[in-house]
């Protein structure tokens, strides 16, 4: 019996007040995934997130219960301590991807990307 569940993406936007602010767009906004399948979500920034110090400050979070979010991936592709290796991050410049190779029931929740290359 196939039991679909939802992985929800959250569209993260800084309200633009000037043309220099970075706008983040995440797709898809939701996924129907069965445990064991692969999930993939993308995040695009309106400007390159490559900082002058050589790092790219792109993070992925999972939110299961408000207001608590769990850091999964930092600086594009580094797994935070304790995050299973089925989670992976990739990308550069303006385009980034989070993949979950074999989704487990505990993975369901709201995922979002965040940049820290520029303050809002």
UniProtKB/Swiss-Prot annotation:
SUPFAM superfamilies: Immunoglobulin. Pfam families: V-set (PF07686). Residues 114-120 are annotated as: Complementarity-determining-3. Residues 60-74 are annotated as: Framework-2. Residues 44-59 are annotated as: Complementarity-determining-1. Residues 75-81 are annotated as: Complementarity-determining-2. Residues 1-20 form the signal peptide. It is found in: Secreted; Cell membrane. GO terms for biological process: adaptive immune response; immune response. Residues 21-120 form the Ig-like domain. Residues 82-113 are annotated as: Framework-3. GO terms for cellular component: extracellular region; immunoglobulin complex; plasma membrane. Disulfide bonds join 43-113. Its main location: secreted. Gene3D superfamilies: Immunoglobulins. SMART domains: IGv (SM00406). Keywords: Adaptive immunity, Cell membrane, Disulfide bond, Immunity, Immunoglobulin, Immunoglobulin domain, Membrane, Secreted, Signal. Residues 21-43 are annotated as: Framework-1. InterPro entries: Ig-like_dom (IPR007110), Ig-like_dom_sf (IPR036179), Ig-like_fold (IPR013783), Ig_V-set (IPR013106), IgV_Light_Chain (IPR050150). Immunoglobulins are composed of two identical heavy chains and two identical light chains; disulfide-linked. V region of the variable domain of immunoglobulin light chains that participates in the antigen recognition. Immunoglobulins, also known as antibodies, are membrane-bound or secreted glycoproteins produced by B lymphocytes. In the recognition phase of humoral immunity, the membrane-bound immunoglobulins serve as receptors which, upon binding of a specific antigen, trigger the clonal expansion and differentiation of B lymphocytes into immunoglobulins-secreting plasma cells. This is Immunoglobulin kappa variable 2D-26. It comes from Homo sapiens (Human).
